[in-house]
Every structure is written in structure tokens, then in C-alpha cells.
């Protein structure tokens, strides 16, 4: 009996492909996303997921990748650092995902990475541009968007070119906010300038009164804003209420559509840096593709966050295609590192064994009088 059992075990071992990492079966590949799906920043995770699903639905309707459908499972990290590690652990240890994508946030990202990196699970696309998640380079993390340093450089360049000299910073009191503050400082230092004044807000709150008082007292020409959309909206409303004439500039993480919705009529003239193409245009092929597939998936509320999710999914799928018919996590890493100047339809990403930055694309948009975005 023991010999028979041993023979069965040996046969089973031989029948199991040597490449079979968790999350891969003959018919499917399981991906995981841990992001914020509840609380003040929920729309960021929801829209990111919508963009991802729009592209994965299309891929699956057309035979999947090497005959396997690509499924997505999500966990809510609530944009809380204390919750984040457990969310990634559930994806990796309980759900046994093959790879990860579409994470959201700097502080939560920093809390997730020790878990995902220790497990050597590839992670594609983080909705954050913070340097602390990019330097030193992490072998298992592939960024799709430009950094906050790239964004704040673009913002400062714009402010200075239009005559602005007094530049303040309103930022979230955590790693995300500090990344944007530091980027602004670097951009100003290059021009022989300094941050004129600053104020902070705690994560997941809208207690901005002290920041409004400190910044408004200095009468800045412009305010660079590095926080979530709820606190940024409240800050702008209160600044306008006290008569500030400053121009407000947000980095992309704010969630453009969510900010515009939260501001209503107070949003006119507010600027936002963007790290993906304008999602309402038609000139860029990948934008038209996003619009068509989002509509098929039932997501007709086009926005920058979903556009980023869509591009993230495209990068992941391209990596899976290049990883071959017998994918492994290490094979996916190597496949992604081989993607040099890949055209996703007018949006380019490039990786190598020493560079996982992906893109440096940055654009500026403004909220118009009707809440729609202008370039």
C-alpha cells in the first residue's frame, strides 16, 4: 500500500508542470489588486479597477493570453497603512494570485511592498509617483506612470513661466505628501527659489483650517497640492471663501474626476498634472481603445484614474504574452524587463533590468466652468 501511494505521489509530481507558480492553471491566470475601495479616497481604487477590468474583459473575450483567461480578485486596504499588509497577504497566501497590479497610494504602497517583495510576486502599476517606492529599484515592482518629481517639475515650470513667484505647498502629512513637497522643493531650488509657505492635513481627514490660515496669510501666487481629493477640495473651498487669489495645482494622485465632482462650481480654474493621456480625446489610439472597451464593459464615465488602470492592464497583459505559454513569476519579471520603448497606442513604456520607471509622460489640465477638463 505504501509503495502504491508513493508511486501515485511520484506520478502526480511528474504530471504537475515544473513552471506552475501559484495562480496559474491550464485555463486561467489569477491576478490580485489591493487598493482603496472604501472611505474618502475610494474612487481612486474603484476607477483604477474599472479601467483594469475593461481591458481584461476584452482580452478574455478574445481568447485570453495563450489560451488562459485572466481573472482579477481585489482586497480593500482602506488607504490605511495598518490594513495594507494583511490585504496583500490574503491575495498571496489565501487567494494564491500569480501577480499583482493596480495598487493605490504611497503610504499604503510602502506598507504593502515588504509583503509582496518577500514573496517575490511581481507588481505592475502603482497609482503613486513617490521616489521612496522607486529608489532603490525593486526587482518585483514595475511602474507605469511618471514620478511626483516629474509632475512637480512640470507644475513649477508652468507657474514660473506665467510669472508666479510665491509658491506654497499644501500636503498630506505622510510619505505621499512629503514626496510631493520634496519634488516641489527640488524644482524650486533649480530656479533659485524656495517654498514660500506650507500647511498640512492628516490622511483620511478634511481638517484643513490650520493649513488655510498659514498659507493664506502669505498671499501666494500658486499652491501646489499633494493630498487626497476630499481634503484638497475642502482646502480650495476654504481658501476661496477667505478671498485667496492663488491658482491651485494638484498632482495626479488627487483623482481628477473625483476632485472636480467634489468641488462643483468651485473647481473652475483648478489645475491638475496628469500622467496618462487625456481620456476624452480621440487623437491618441489607446484613448479611443479605452473609450470603446470601457463602454462595452459598462463604464461610460471616462476619467484619468480608469485610463491609468487600463494602461496598467495593457502592460501586464503584454508582459504575460512575452512570458510565454509556461509562465512563472521570475519569467514575468524578465519579460517585463525586456519591454523597451513599447508603444501601447501612443503611450510608451520602457523597462530594463536596471530601470523599472516605465514612463515620464506628464501633461497639465484645467477644470473648466462646467466641470469638464481642458488641456
Where are the regions that the model predicts?
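Short, low-complexity disordered leader/linker segments with a strong preference
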Residues: 1-30, 374
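Acidic/histidine-rich, surface-exposed loop or edge segments in extracytoplasmic proteins
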Residues: 32-40, 272
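Segments of small-molecule ligand-sensing domains
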Residues: 296-306, 317-373
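Extracellular/periplasmic periplasmic-binding protein-like sensory domains
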Residues: 236-309, 367, 371-374
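Periplasmic-binding protein-like
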Residues: 91-104, 124-126, 168-171, 219-228, ...
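Loop/turn elements at helix/coil->beta-strand transitions in domains of secreted/extracellular proteins
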Residues: 27-29, 67-70, 94-99, 118-122, ...
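Extracellular/periplasmic Venus flytrap/periplasmic-binding protein
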Residues: 83-86, 130-132, 139-243, 278-288, ...
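Beta-alpha junction/loop-to-helix N-cap segments that form part of ligand/metal-binding clefts
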Residues: 22, 28-30, 43-50, 58-132, ...
Amino acid at each position: 500500500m505504501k509503495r502504491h501511494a508513493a508511486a501515485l505521489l511520484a506520478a502526480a509530481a511528474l504530471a504537475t508542470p515544473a513552471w506552475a507558480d501559484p495562480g496559474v492553471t491550464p485555463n486561467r491566470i489569477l491576478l490580485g489588486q489591493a487598493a482603496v475601495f472604501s472611505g474618502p479616497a475610494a474612487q481612486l481604487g474603484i476607477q483604477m479597477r474599472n479601467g483594469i477590468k475593461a481591458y481584461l474583459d476584452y482580452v478574455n473575450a478574445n481568447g485570453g493570453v495563450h489560451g488562459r483567461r485572466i481573472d482579477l480578485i481585489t482586497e480593500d486596504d482602506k488607504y490605511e497603512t495598518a490594513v495594507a499588509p494583511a490585504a496583500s497577504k490574503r491575495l498571496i497566501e489565501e487567494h494564491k494570485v500569480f501577480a499583482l497590479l493596480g495598487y493605490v497610494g504611497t503610504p499604503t504602497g510602502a506598507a504593502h511592498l515588504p509583503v509582496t517583495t518577500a514573496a517575490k510576486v511581481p507588481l505592475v502599476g502603482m497609482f503613486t509617483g513617490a521616489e521612496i517606492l522607486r529608489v532603490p529599484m525593486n526587482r518585483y515592482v514595475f511602474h507605469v506612470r511618471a514620478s511626483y518629481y516629474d509632475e512637480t517639475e512640470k507644475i513649477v515650470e508652468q507657474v514660473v513661466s506665467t510669472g508666479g513667484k510665491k509658491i506654497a505647498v499644501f500636503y498630506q502629512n505622510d510619505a505621499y505628501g512629503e514626496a510631493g513637497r520634496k519634488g516641489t522643493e527640488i524644482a524650486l531650488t533649480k530656479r533659485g527659489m524656495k517654498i514660500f509657505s506650507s500647511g498640512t492635513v492628516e490622511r483620511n481627514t478634511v481638517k484643513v483650517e490650520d493649513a488655510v490660515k498659514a498659507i493664506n496669510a502669505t498671499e501666494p501666487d500658486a499652491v501646489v497640492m499633494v493630498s487626497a481629493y476630499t481634503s484638497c477640495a475642502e482646502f480650495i473651498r476654504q481658501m476661496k471663501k477667505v478671498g485667496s487669489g492663488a491658482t491651485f495645482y494638484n498632482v495626479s494622485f488627487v483623482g481628477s474626476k473625483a476632485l472636480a465632482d467634489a468641488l462643483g462650481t468651485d473647481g473652475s480654474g483648478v489645475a491638475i498634472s496628469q500622467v496618462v493621456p487625456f481620456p476624452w480625446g480621440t487623437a491618441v489610439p489607446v484613448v479611443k481603445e479605452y473609450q470603446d472597451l470601457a463602454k462595452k464593459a459598462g463604464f461610460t464615465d471616462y476619467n484619468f484614474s480608469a485610463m491609468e488602470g487600463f494602461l496598467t492592464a495593457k502592460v501586464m497583459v503584454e508582459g504575460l504574452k512575452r512570458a510565454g505559454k509556461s509562465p512563472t513569476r521570475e519569467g514575468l519579471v524578465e519579460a517585463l524587463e525586456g519591454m523597451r520603448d513599447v508603444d501601447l497606442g501612443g503611450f510608451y513604456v520602457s523597462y530594463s533590468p536596471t530601470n523599472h520607471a516605465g514612463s515620464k509622460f506628464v501633461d497639465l489640465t484645467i477644470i473648466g466652468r462646467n466641470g469638464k477638463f481642458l488641456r
